[in-house]
Amino acid sequence: MDRDQQLIAFCQQAVQIPSPSGQEREVAQLMKRKMEEYGFDEVLIDRYGSVLGRMRGNRPGKTILLDGHIDHVDVIDAGEWSHDPFGGEIDQGRIYGRGTSDMKGSVTAMISAVAHFAEDTGRDFAGEICVSC
């Protein structure tokens, strides 16, 4: 599977997990698992359910933080949707579902981008890149 397909599948997995505010545990576990699979140096879920992953470069330097959220507005009108709010279906090149644009799509892209940057550079960068959600 190429990187684009991996990211699409990751986003679909995230969208398929309902995570209204205060109920993010399952999607947080997915983010943690993916960060670990991608080789993040440290991954933790804090007592509030937020996920933090660190990818360290080979040289000392500053830290950059990419931050997003993995909860979403509750679905109260599922019958009004043209696609299943938790289906993660692709239709005409678009992924449909609650959280695709706000903001599970962005979080999955950030995690993937950090992992691929580290891989492509052989971690030859200064500092560390953190992703939190």
Spans of model-derived segments:
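N-terminal helical capping/dimerization or prosegment-like subdomains
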Residues: 1-65, 69-76
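Active-site metal-coordination/substrate-binding segment of hydrolases
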Residues: 62-130
